[in-house]
């Protein structure tokens, strides 16, 4: 969704609070907790989970490995839940033709750099760049803004899976609004 008029373009960015992240964090947490509890059950010699039997699992080779995988999975799961809780990556792109300023805002992890805020003059924007990355199973289309003195800045939403036609249309609208050219490959 773009809120745009003739002189102002505001595009909200979703960030990490997506259904897929909730799904993967939940599945990872459940699996990691199961691995850890089965490994710990083999250490204690009794079942902590009524559904999973740990009687055949010997602690020294298998139980330790299952505990290790469980702890590693719990760390990855907690990282995913932190990104969801802090909504890392969300923000907005704002282009104001009236003042001639481009503002890009994103939320990060807590700390000194929690708020990522880029602000630069509109005249420093050289072009909109569209990049297509294809691999065996999927293709990813990324939209960048080329700005003088800065590396290419990604503009497209993280979870946005637009096809090539939609991405070209979005790039054309943005380039028309900014009065710049499009580079694509």
Curated annotation (Swiss-Prot):
Keywords in alphabetical order: Chloroplast, Membrane, Photosynthesis, Plastid, Thylakoid, Transmembrane, Transmembrane helix
Pfam families: Ycf4 (PF02392)
One annotated GO biological process: photosynthesis
Family: Belongs to the Ycf4 family.
UniProt keyword rRNA processing present: no
Gene: ycf4
Subcellular location: Plastid, Chloroplast thylakoid membrane
Annotated GO CC locations: chloroplast thylakoid membrane; photosystem I
Function statement: Seems to be required for the assembly of the photosystem I complex.
Transmembrane segment boundaries: 22-42, 57-77
Name the record gives this protein: Photosystem I assembly protein Ycf4
Bilayer topology annotation: Multi-pass membrane protein
Keyword check for Plastid: yes
């Amino acid at each position: 969704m773009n809120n745009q008029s003739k002189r102002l373009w505001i595009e909200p960015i979703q960030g990490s609070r997506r259904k897929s992240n909730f799904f993967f964090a939940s599945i990872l947490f459940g699996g990691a907790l199961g691995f850890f509890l089965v490994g710990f059950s083999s250490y204690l010699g009794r079942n902590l989970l009524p559904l999973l039997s740990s009687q055949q699992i010997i602690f020294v080779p298998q139980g330790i490995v299952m505990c290790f995988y469980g702890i590693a999975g719990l760390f990855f799961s907690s990282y995913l839940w932190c990104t969801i809780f802090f909504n890392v990556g969300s923000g907005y792109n704002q282009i104001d033709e009236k003042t001639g300023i481009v503002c890009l805002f994103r939320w990060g992890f807590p700390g000194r750099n929690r708020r990522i805020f880029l602000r630069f003059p509109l005249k420093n924007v050289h072009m909109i760049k569209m990049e297509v990355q294809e691999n065996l199973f999927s293709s990813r289309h990324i939209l960048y803004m080329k700005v003088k003195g800065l590396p290419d800045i990604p503009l497209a939403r993280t979870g946005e899976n637009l096809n090539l036609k939609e991405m070209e249309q979005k790039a054309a609208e943005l380039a028309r609004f900014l009065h710049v050219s499009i580079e694509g490959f």
